[in-house]
Regions:
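Conserved HGGG/HGGXW glycine-rich cap/lid loop of the alpha/beta-hydrolase fold
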Residues: 1-37
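Acidic catalytic loop of the alpha/beta-hydrolase fold
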Residues: 179-183
């Protein structure tokens, strides 16, 4: 069983390093524009790009895992191309992802050249992750820039499959941090009630980047999930 990890807004594949180093048959993608290539303007476009990526590599026995914006991409992929997948892993995400203006405004200001609030936002997002990881990830996210984050946030803001998510019939692992302020636990609870073959895990003392804050806990959950659908 192979796993492909999809990052969140303004991110890049290396945020999944605790997972890709742990799971030998796994890798993480960089979505277009993060930093190379042209940014995509909707979750639907990202899904179609990911389908081409997967098809070109002839991936089989595949599990898709996504965080936040990446989770939205994985959910919609499961609806459109269920035949490609054995299961999905959704971390810190939801069936609808409205984005508060307090997250949009710093990106907009940074694009105009006023980066202070955006730098604060990026640093706050990684606040609870390990120190060495945090320092490197913040620098990489700043290098990718505010335009990518804003574009991704706007994709999230228009994403809504609340009336369709029940159509997902494949096994799903849903993980969220108990203290996640960006995608509260109620988002995960909704997915857990609507996706028939799902397992919900709320991780104590963890926030939006639960997979980096509590990698041992998350990796064990992923390992058990993949083992369960492989047997």
């Amino acid at each position: 069983m192979s796993i492909i990890f999809v990052h969140g807004s303004g991110g890049y594949g290396d945020i999944w390093r605790y997972q890709t180093e742990y799971f030998s048959d796994s890798h993480a993608v960089d979505l277009p524009g993060h930093p190379h290539g042209q940014l995509l303007s909707s979750v639907e476009e990202c899904v179609d790009w990911l389908r081409e990526y997967i098809t070109a590599r002839e991936c089989s026995d595949l599990v898709l895992a996504g965080h936040s914006f990446g989770g939205a991409i994985v959910l919609l992929y499961a609806l459109k191309y269920s035949q490609d997948l054995k299961g999905i892993i959704i971390i810190g995400s939801g069936a609808r992802l409205r984005v508060h203006p307090m997250f949009l405004a710093p990106c907009e200001e940074a694009i105009k050249g006023n980066s202070y609030q955006w730098y604060q936002l990026v640093e706050e997002m990684y606040r609870s992750t390990p120190e060495d990881y945090k320092k490197e990830m913040i620098e990489k996210q700043k290098a990718i820039g505010p335009a990518a984050m804003l574009t991704d946030f706007l994709c999230c803001d228009s994403f809504d499959i609340m009336d369709r998510v029940h159509e997902i019939k494949m096994p799903a692992l849903i993980i969220t941090g108990e203290s996640d302020a960006m995608t509260p636990a109620k988002y995960a609870n909704y997915l857990g009630t609507k996706i028939a073959h799902s397992k919900l895990m709320i991780v104590p003392q963890a926030g939006h980047f639960v997979f980096a804050e509590k990698p041992e806990v998350v990796n064990k959950a992923i390992k058990d999930f993949v083992k369960g659908i492989s047997s």
